[in-house]
């Protein structure tokens, strides 16, 4: 089918006219200057005969060889890219405008049409006239001039017919419009310039026509038809296929029919042309027999289209829906055409395959629509919940005909949904193939571990690398992790170490880099970490592996510039580069460094930061030039399965990248969440577990750390104070009215945030500082030396957007406003503070210490006032704390037992820090993502903890926080499903691999 390439009928955009002449005519006659050539080709039909320029021919008339002027010649240039110049057919220019071979009156009429045009070659024999008449029968609406151009631009009648199908549509020839736009006086030099813009003009014209008359949905459907057609004819240009579809009123099957009807004959013609060797100026031609055959074929095409229209091909809507009879007729014709093409594959349209495959997929579609759940039906492209519900109401579908009839006759449904099922089925097949690949990898790894265990090879047991500190020893489960990493690396498989937080993933990664070092791979390696854990990584490297050279890539832009120079010019020696996510991708120079630097191994700490494959961070880090990758994350499954698939795609892009779109659709959380887990959801979880099995190792603390103290979770529902409850109710009613007016998702997010703030503390809104009070305060601010020249109206505008607590701090800062400070009772007026006061008092009596988290830094500001009021000693760390100061604050809290409370913001203090000196975790306000809270609470519940850990969550009773808690529990259930083995006990992933490794190591 690739030989059927209509590109050769288009204008040549690249070649120069004088190059053509130089190759063919230089030896016969000197070439004419450009000025003369320009005069020759710019004679227009309206020029009188007496004044017409009549230059001599540029070349000698070699036998059987002729040359056309600029218009015709451009048609031939494209063809020359496909065939030898000796295989092309043109006709010699007759200077007097007549041909000796023409004798009858009808031929004279034909010449009368062509004689005025300087761009038309003359008729040499009667065969051209016969071809013209045949084309006239096939394209009765086109004039002789257009049809003759087709004959001259192709070597066969079949080619002319095929070109005509593409170029002529029912509303007029777009090709003719295109030619009319070219100035008549364009010279060969100008022609080359104009030719470069012709395709763009054509695209713009088609786009503008469609945009003005079609809706966005119709345009998308038309684009889908073009793509489907291009899969059958990959060598054809999209715009040419679009014209074929326009010719057939955007009927995909009719357009496919028309193109396939001529493809076979055109292929034969091209093959025959390639076999014939034309030399010494002998003219290549087709026999009349073949011409008759192709003409009959073209007529058959017209007749078949008419017959289809008469036999029940009904166009519905905008020409995209057909009756079942039409589908059957179309498939019969396609089956005849594809009988000779045994290698044709099933593509977007199942009816284009052979009969067995077609019936097989019909059966799959019928079975799917009959048995699929609502969630599965909802995954069909363009299928809404309402349509899915209608499909279930139409069941049962006893046969294909019954399905087709019910779908086409039901309001709101169409046959498009039937054929869109193929997309979903195809995506499922892609995921199944991916699962089979993963299963094969898993079997290979399991087989090797089993074999090594049975053989008892001592060399398999990878001990703690010799360059690691002798004073520190890996724990047994950490040694298993090291061996697992080494095994997968040996098989060139990247991995995700997903041990539960607190099991020492950092140490296992350092041990693996040390193992690479002692086995001959000294780097360079890269470790990318969050800013909050960078100091901890440097400390762990120095403690566990002091002999490795660690380079910290961090600092200002100027400092990183010098570091880049040293790295690229090998001024500094290093084995491992440690940097942050921000420094690795913040500028083009940073990204360029890690693309140019050939890294042997890259480690990404807190890998769940790469859970969104559409994020800029994800896409930039994918370009790192690393041979192997390792992700460390304590929460591989957070909101949905798609995030897990994103992690797998990041570590194994060569395996997953080709299936990204299928993975996105099948594992996206399009279906609505329900309390009961559907069969479909269970199947998706099973599929995800099978895919992730070879690449992820996860152990939980309850299994591997028998000596680790238990952790208790407790939820405290806090009744709001009376004033707070009234304010919350007023805010809720106000927001309900605004939601009814807008109903936008962005507004809903704002509503949720406003309610969360009010549930935590009333001072996070502006309630007490009225507009009148702010007017007075803005004028008083003019008495301050820093604001004496300020505009009070601008000060008022700034104050309007501030919260009550911010305005209270402003009053503390400026003495002129001190009279407007809030009373301490208002600051302490919070339902959660009432619970917290008693809670902290009891904890302090027992001698325990507290780590308190909040989502809002302003809430931490208010909590500081509360702690000072009750004389509790504390330290604080949030996103504004300098990176260099964070490690000192952590050390201070862990060593000074008089510090009772460590205040942290959940995002800044919830990652990668060790606070085992405390055993009580209080979450003042929960996160929408429960895994952020889990990360936070595991700052205490980790290796090194000796006391029982209690996690207390404060939930505002009767507030939006209760709904957030319910959603969080559903998300946590997904993780439990993913980390549960086949027997139902929570365990490792994959269980069998870790068990085998444990056995092989004798642990």
From Swiss-Prot:
EC number(s) in its UniProt entry? 3.6.4.12
Which UniProt keyword terms apply here? Answer: ATP-binding, Chromatin regulator, Chromosome, DNA damage, DNA repair, DNA-binding, Helicase, Hydrolase, Nucleotide-binding, Nucleus
Tell me the superkingdom of the source.
Eukaryota
Q: Where does ATP bind?
A: 499-506
GO annotation terms (biological process): DNA double-strand break processing
InterPro entries from the entry?
CUE (IPR003892), Helicase_ATP-bd (IPR014001), Helicase_C-like (IPR001650), P-loop_NTPase (IPR027417), SNF2-like_sf (IPR038718), SNF2/RAD54-like_C (IPR049730), SNF2_N (IPR000330), UBA-like_sf (IPR009060)
Q: Look at the named UniProt entry and state the broad enzyme category this protein falls under.
A: hydrolase
Residues in domain Helicase C-terminal?
Answer: 835-997
Domain named Helicase ATP-binding: residues: 486-654
Keyword NAD assigned to the entry: answer is no
Q: Which Gene3D superfamilies match?
A: P-loop containing nucleotide triphosphate hydrolases, Tandem AAA-ATPase domain
Keyword DNA repair set for record: yes
Q: Name one Pfam family in it.
A: SNF2-rel_dom
- What are the start and end residues of every segment in region (Disordered)? 15-130, 172-235, 274-351
Q: Where is the composition biased (Basic and acidic residues)?
A: 172-188, 221-235, 274-294, 321-333
Function summary: DNA helicase that possesses intrinsic ATP-dependent nucleosome-remodeling activity and is both required for DNA repair and heterochromatin organization. Promotes DNA end resection of double-strand breaks (DSBs) following DNA damage: probably acts by weakening histone DNA interactions in nucleosomes flanking DSBs. Required for the restoration of heterochromatin organization after replication.
- The protein, known as: SWI/SNF-related matrix-associated actin-dependent regulator of chromatin subfamily A containing DEAD/H box 1
Instruction: Write the lineage as a comma-separated list.
Output: Eukaryota, Metazoa, Chordata, Craniata, Vertebrata
């Amino acid at each position: 089918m690739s030989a059927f390439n209509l590109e050769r009928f288009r204008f040549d955009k690249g070649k120069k006219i004088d190059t053509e002449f130089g190759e063919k005519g230089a030896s016969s006659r000197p070439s004419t200057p450009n000025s003369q050539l320009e005069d020759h080709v710019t004679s227009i039909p309206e020029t009188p005969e007496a004044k017409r320029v009549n230059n001599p021919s540029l070349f000698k008339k070699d036998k059987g060889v002729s040359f056309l002027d600029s218009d015709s010649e451009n048609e031939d240039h494209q063809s020359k890219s496909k065939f030898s110049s000796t295989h092309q057919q043109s006709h010699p220019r007759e200077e007097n405008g007549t041909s000796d071979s023409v004798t009858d009156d009808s031929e004279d009429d034909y010449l009368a049409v062509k004689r005025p045009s300087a761009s038309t070659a003359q008729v040499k024999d009667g065969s051209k006239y016969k071809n013209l008449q045949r084309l006239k029968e096939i394209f009765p609406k086109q004039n002789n001039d257009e049809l003759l151009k087709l004959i001259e631009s192709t070597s066969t009648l079949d080619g002319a017919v095929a070109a005509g199908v593409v170029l002529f549509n029912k509303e007029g020839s777009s090709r003719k419009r295109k030619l009319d736009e070219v100035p008549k006086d364009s010279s060969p030099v100008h022609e080359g310039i104009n030719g470069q813009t012709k395709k763009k003009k054509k695209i713009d014209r088609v786009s503008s026509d469609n945009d003005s008359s079609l809706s966005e949905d119709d345009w998308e459907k038309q684009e889908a038809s073009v793509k489907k057609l291009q899969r059958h004819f990959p060598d054809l240009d999209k715009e040419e296929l679009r014209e074929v579809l326009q010719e057939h009123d955007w009927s995909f099957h009719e357009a496919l029919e028309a193109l396939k009807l001529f493809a076979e004959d055109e292929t034969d013609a091209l093959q025959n042309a390639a076999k014939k060797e034309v030399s010494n100026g002998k003219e290549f031609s087709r026999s009349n027999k073949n011409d008759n055959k192709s003409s009959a074929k073209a007529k058959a095409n017209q007749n078949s289209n008419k017959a289809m229209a008469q036999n029940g091909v009904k166009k519905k809507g905008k020409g995209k829906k057909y009756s079942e009879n039409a589908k059957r007729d179309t498939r019969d014709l396609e089956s005849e055409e594809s009988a000779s093409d045994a290698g044709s594959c099933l593509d977007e349209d199942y009816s284009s395959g052979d009969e067995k495959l077609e019936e097989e997929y019909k059966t799959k579609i019928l079975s799917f629509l009959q048995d699929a759940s609502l969630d599965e039906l909802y995954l069909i492209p363009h299928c809404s919940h309402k349509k899915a519900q209608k499909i279930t109401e139409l069941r049962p579908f006893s046969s294909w005909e019954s399905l087709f009839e019910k779908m086409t006759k039901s309001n709101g449904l169409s046959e498009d949904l039937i054929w869109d099922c193929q997309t979903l089925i195809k995506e499922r097949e892609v995921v199944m193939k991916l699962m089979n690949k993963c299963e094969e990898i898993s079997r290979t790894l399991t087989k090797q571990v089993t074999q090594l265990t049975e053989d008892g090879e001592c060399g398999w047991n990878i001990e703690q690398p010799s360059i690691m500190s002798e004073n520190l020893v890996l724990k047994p489960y950490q040694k298993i992790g090291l061996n697992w990493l080494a095994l997968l690396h040996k098989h060139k498989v990247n991995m995700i170490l997903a041990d539960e937080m607190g099991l020492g993933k950092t140490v296992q990664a350092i041990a693996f880099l040390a193992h690479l070092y002692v086995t001959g791979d000294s780097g360079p390696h890269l470790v990318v970490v969050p800013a909050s854990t960078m100091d901890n990584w440097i400390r762990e490297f120095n403690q566990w592996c002091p002999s490795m050279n660690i380079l910290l890539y961090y600092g200002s832009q100027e400092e990183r510039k010098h570091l880049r120079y040293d790295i690229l010019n090998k001024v500094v020696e290093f084995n491992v580069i440690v940097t942050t996510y921000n420094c690795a991708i913040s500028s083009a120079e940073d990204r360029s460094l890690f693309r140019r630097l050939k890294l042997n191994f890259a480690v990404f700490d807190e890998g769940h930061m790469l859970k969104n494959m559409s994020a800029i961070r994800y896409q930039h880090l994918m370009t790192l030039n690393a041979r192997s990758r390792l992700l460390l994350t304590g929460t591989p499954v957070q909101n949905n399965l798609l995030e897990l698939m994103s992690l797998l795609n990041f570590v194994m892009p060569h395996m997953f990248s080709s299936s990204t779109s299928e993975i996105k659709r099948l594992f996206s959380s399009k279906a609505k969440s329900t309390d009961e887990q559907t069969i479909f959801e269970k199947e998706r979880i099973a599929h995800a577990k099978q895919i992730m099995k070879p690449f992820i190792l996860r152990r939980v603390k309850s299994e591997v750390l028998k000596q680790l103290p238990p952790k208790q979770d407790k939820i405290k529902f806090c009744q709001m104070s009376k004033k707070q409850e009234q304010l919350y109710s007023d805010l809720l009613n106000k927001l309900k009215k605004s939601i009814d007016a807008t109903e936008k998702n962005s507004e809903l997010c704002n509503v949720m945030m406003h309610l969360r703030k009010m549930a935590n503390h009333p001072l996070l809104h502006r309630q007490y500082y009225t507009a009148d009070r702010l007017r007075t305060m803005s004028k008083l601010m003019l008495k301050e030396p820093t604001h004496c020249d300020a505009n009070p109206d601008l000060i008022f505008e700034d104050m309007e957007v501030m919260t009550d607590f911010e305005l209270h701090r402003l009053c503390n800062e400026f003495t002129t406003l001190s009279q407007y400070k809030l009373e301490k009772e208002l600051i302490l007026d919070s339902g959660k503070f009432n619970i917290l006061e008693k809670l902290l008092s009891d904890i302090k009596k027992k001698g325990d210490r507290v780590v308190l988290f909040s989502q809002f830094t302003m809430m931490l500001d208010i909590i500081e006032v509360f702690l000072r009021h009750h004389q509790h000693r504390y330290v604080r760390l949030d996103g504004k704390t300098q990176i260099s100061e964070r490690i000192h604050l952590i050390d201070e809290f862990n060593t000074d037992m008089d510090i009772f409370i460590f205040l942290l913001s959940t995002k800044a203090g919830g990652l990668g820090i060790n606070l085992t000196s405390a055993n009580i975790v209080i979450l003042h306000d929960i996160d929408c993502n429960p895994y952020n809270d889990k990360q936070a609470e595991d700052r205490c519940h980790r290796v090194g903890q000796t006391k029982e850990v209690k996690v207390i969550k404060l939930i505002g009773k009767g507030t939006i926080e209760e709904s957030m808690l319910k959603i969080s529990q559903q998300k946590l259930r997904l993780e439990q499903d993913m980390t549960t083995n086949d027997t139902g006990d929570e365990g490792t992933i994959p269980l069998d691999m870790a068990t085998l490794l444990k056995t092989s190591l004798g642990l």
